[in-house]
């Protein structure tokens, strides 16, 4: 990729090949331009590691941040071009690791917008301050499809998916506004401009529980793989309470409805989880994808062969070829057609087992307005104000 400034306000970018989602791609922060003189002055290794090594051209600038403190400020930038539209003098951010603590701080008037999850979110669903933000965020099971693993067999993967009651999972286990998943790409991520339909809706398949069909597929899969005795599956995940609750639910569903299978759960800190996954020491892994930008390719690309995020080692030439075609075409019609076909192929091959679409729960003071919540990307407080 070549980049050249051809004038004060014109940037020319030359690509090796067409990228249909280019305009969305460059909204990702890693592509935002930097002040070269300032970066050179502070050094590339130090740039962006504290308030003094960060430069801003937005409505606010970073202040009181050392790089490790839990509380810092965004102060109004008096050089911002649209000063008249900015109402807040500063924004105070506080990192709160515990949802119950966040709730208490909100109740004490020390937070105006608090993100909560887990048991806390579940218990506050009827609070008038609750706001659900549907994110471009899908929670799913990665399935170990390495050679010699029992779940390399597609029928066994399909059977697992068919016994999981996603309605029960979201309504009783999570009860935080999350919704059953029927596709890898979450609703609201993108509208297919060639069909005018939500991409998630047009590529969804039924994930309704079907125990009888699951048992037939499981029996056929066991016969094909020639597995003797009990299939031992280890379900790994991080050590958060919500992850443990989901793991126990999946474990119960699988063992209740399928024969000759034992699911062991293993919940470890995130670093340990990544090691287990990279070493292939799992049968199933609880994971999620939160889109960087609002386009289906951002999801589907992580499951191409060789992608570092593809811990289950799903590999399918048809799927790979469809995504490559989508990534290299300049035709919007071809782009969206290839993505639809790829999403359908992923579902058909059961490359992963989608569980639910995450709904982020916020506690927001009634006086706060003008905040923009996005499915993909960060919450925007630029033009926020208090009524």
List each language-model region with its residue ranges:
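Extracytoplasmic/peripheral linker and loop segments enriched in polar/acidic and small residues
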Residues: 1-4, 260-273, 301-366, 387
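Gly/Pro-rich hinge or "lid" segments in bacterial periplasmic/extracellular proteins
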Residues: 9, 15, 19-86, 90, ...
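Alpha-helical secondary-structure segments
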Residues: 10-12, 59, 89-90, 137-187, ...
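Bilobed periplasmic-binding protein-like "clamshell/Venus-flytrap" ligand-binding domains
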Residues: 20-26, 220-242, 285, 330-364
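Ligand/substrate-recognition segments at binding pockets and active sites
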Residues: 67, 211, 219-291, 360
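Ligand-site clamp/hinge motif
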Residues: 77-123
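Structural transition elements
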Residues: 180-220, 242-244
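Long beta-strand-rich cores associated with HINT superfamily self-processing modules
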Residues: 362-387
